[in-house]
């Protein structure tokens, strides 16, 4: 009985350390993925907030009051595409030809996992083309890693912060000099809740 009493706490401590190591490795890999994606940004960068209300899944496209922080990041790779990175709720997505990229059932399972949406840019003014005939469209969607790669973990918090400056007489156009990404990886409880 004494041996079991000593081994059980040691085994639990070992599992806890192993889980923390996995969480740190996952967080490092996710940060590197974000860094690699943003590396090609050569147009605008927009800080926004991911959708958290299932009744308004397109709120990520709403105008924001802050130019320097958010839970989602949209940036352009001129002249090819616009990319949106977040970990929050995503609507069902279709491409411009009406083909499903992501069903609503698939989208609901991906809340808490890093995902990237890619949109075409309009040819006239290089603004993001998020809609066609009133429907949100994307030309590609991917997750950084399959859900199984998270090993029972998920992203509980993702936040982007920028250090920036504004030119004299410039209107609402800050110049980003550095960006910080804060990511928290957590474990869901036994019921699968956050």
Regions found by a protein language model. Give the residues of each.
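Surface-exposed beta-strand edges and their flanking turn/coil or helix-capping segments
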Residues: 36, 44-47, 88, 129
């Amino acid at each position: 009985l004494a041996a079991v009493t000593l081994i059980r706490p040691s085994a639990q401590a070992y599992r806890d350390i192993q889980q923390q190591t996995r969480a740190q490795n996952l967080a490092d890999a996710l940060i590197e993925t974000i860094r690699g994606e943003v590396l090609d940004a050569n147009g605008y960068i927009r800080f926004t907030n991911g959708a958290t209300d299932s009744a308004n899944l397109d709120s990520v496209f709403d105008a924001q009051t802050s130019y320097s922080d958010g839970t989602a990041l949209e940036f352009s790779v001129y002249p090819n595409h616009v990319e949106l990175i977040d970990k929050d709720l995503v609507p069902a997505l279709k491409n411009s030809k009406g083909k499903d990229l992501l069903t609503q059932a698939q989208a609901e399972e991906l809340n808490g996992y890093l995902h990237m949406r890619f949109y075409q840019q309009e040819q006239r003014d290089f603004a993001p083309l998020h809609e066609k005939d009133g429907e949100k469209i994307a030309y590609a969607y991917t997750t950084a890693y399959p859900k199984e790669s998270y090993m029972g973990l998920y992203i509980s918090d993702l936040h982007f912060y920028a250090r920036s400056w504004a030119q004299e007489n410039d209107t609402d156009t800050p110049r980003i000099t550095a960006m910080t990404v804060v990511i928290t990886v957590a474990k869901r409880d036994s019921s699968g809740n956050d």
